[in-house]
Amino acid sequence: MTTLTARPEAITFDPQQSALIVVDMQNAYATPGGYLDLAGFDVSTTRPVIANIQTAVTAARAAGMLIIWFQNGWDEQYVEAGGPGSPNFHKSNALKTMRNQPQLQGKLLAKGSWDYQLVDELMPQPGDIVLPKPRYSGFFNTPLDSILRSRGIRHLVFTGIATNVCVESTLRDGFFLEYFGVVLEDATHQAGPEFAQKAALFNIETFFGWVSDVETFCDALSSTSFARIA
């Protein structure tokens, strides 16, 4: 078992019955010229987050954790995005950006597009699981819950973008399904001003889960590995 120092208190988990979840590390969310950038959100500080996710993934994989990668988006015709009868049609900033800039139609978050692809620095490896998702939460219309339960996984460690949207939405839904959720704060990035990051982390550590960081996470996994060898 691994004990991870976190806020508001430490949490203990078995790495081999836990998953590291990488949320939406796509060009859309982390690269200049991607959806968030074109929609007016600042993505200039995402590079350190990418590096920290690389570090966390390497440590988690070595410890035997399942790695799950999410990609947010829809089919090329945007049927999966929902029409006017869906609140997603009205609230998705990607869909609104394309309606306001018709030349972008079919380019934002469309499966197969550059925007939809994971950033070059973060590539899934054999044994990892890659899941598409059509909404903010990774539990909505995906097999995530079934995948986790069939493997006896109850603890989820979250990284990715955006902390205050898809990361928090997935962690919250997991909380209601009896999963223990931890966010590595320096391996996440918000959509919007910095206060959005702080508010999301406050909500998570106060009501829905735990907050730690990449160095602490890696040290905890390393200590567990040494203990097993000894």
Curated annotation (Swiss-Prot):
GO annotation, biological process: nitrogen utilization; uracil catabolic process
Active site annotation, chain numbering: D24 (proton acceptor), K133, C166 (nucleophile)
E.C. number(s) listed in UniProt: 3.5.1.110
Reactions it catalyzes: (Z)-3-ureidoacrylate + H2O + H(+) = (Z)-3-aminoacrylate + NH4(+) + CO2; (Z)-3-ureidoacrylate + H2O = (Z)-3-aminoacrylate + carbamate + H(+); (Z)-2-methylureidoacrylate + H2O + H(+) = (Z)-2-methylaminoacrylate + NH4(+) + CO2
Database matches in CDD domains: cysteine_hydrolases (cd00431)
Top-level lineage group: Bacteria
One function term, GO molecular function aspect: hydrolase activity, acting on carbon-nitrogen (but not peptide) bonds, in linear amides
Induction of its expression: Up-regulated by the nitrogen regulatory protein C (NtrC also called GlnG) and repressed by RutR.
Record InterPro entries: Isochorismatase-like_dom, Isochorismatase-like_hydrls, Isochorismatase-like_sf, RutB
Keyword terms of this UniProt record: Hydrolase
Pfam family, one: Isochorismatase
HAMAP family: RutB (MF_00830)
Function of the protein: Hydrolyzes ureidoacrylate to form aminoacrylate and carbamate. The carbamate hydrolyzes spontaneously, thereby releasing one of the nitrogen atoms of the pyrimidine ring as ammonia and one of its carbon atoms as CO2.
Family affiliation: Belongs to the isochorismatase family. RutB subfamily.
The protein's name in its UniProt record: Ureidoacrylate amidohydrolase RutB
Phylogenetic lineage: Bacteria, Pseudomonadati, Pseudomonadota, Gammaproteobacteria, Enterobacterales
